[in-house]
């Protein structure tokens, strides 16, 4: 099966998304991941030099093809976190609209916020494909961790 996985976080970020995708490859599937630039878990929650200025936007690792959308680095503070989420959403949506490959199914691998998987919906609707959502929704806890007060929710 030819699978498109959409998740804001992928290797080298410290999330298990890469483990799942690599296991799917070991089981005989073709996997492409639409993801963002690494920044969560990186030094100062910033984008590493090897991903700046348009570098490494398409990669192949352990059989998985990786397509990277631009995004604002996570850094610290609630405003930066919101910019990070919105920039991935916007840029990955643009990328999803232009993917030429035909995938059999889309897997939305979503931590939070839920809009992370919208690029998968964009692709699935355009190409009339099924989409599976694997959701680890942490809202509103992720907002309080990002600096929003409990009273503001």
Language-model segment annotations:
Residues 1-54, 58-59:
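N-terminal subdomain of nucleotide-sugar transferases
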Residues 4, 32-34, 67, 107, ...:
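Hydrophobic/aromatic beta-strand patches that form the interior of the parallel beta-sheet core
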Residues 8, 73-80, 127-153:
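Acceptor-binding helix/loop patch of EC 2.4 sugar-transfer enzymes
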Residues 14, 85-93, 105-129, 133-142:
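An aromatic- and histidine-rich active-site surface loop
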Residues 18-21, 46-49, 82, 120-124, ...:
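Short, glycine/charged-enriched secondary-structure capping and boundary segments
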Residues 25, 60, 121, 125:
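Anion (oxyanion) recognition and catalysis
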Residues 35-98:
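A conserved catalytic-core segment of Leloir-type glycosyltransferases
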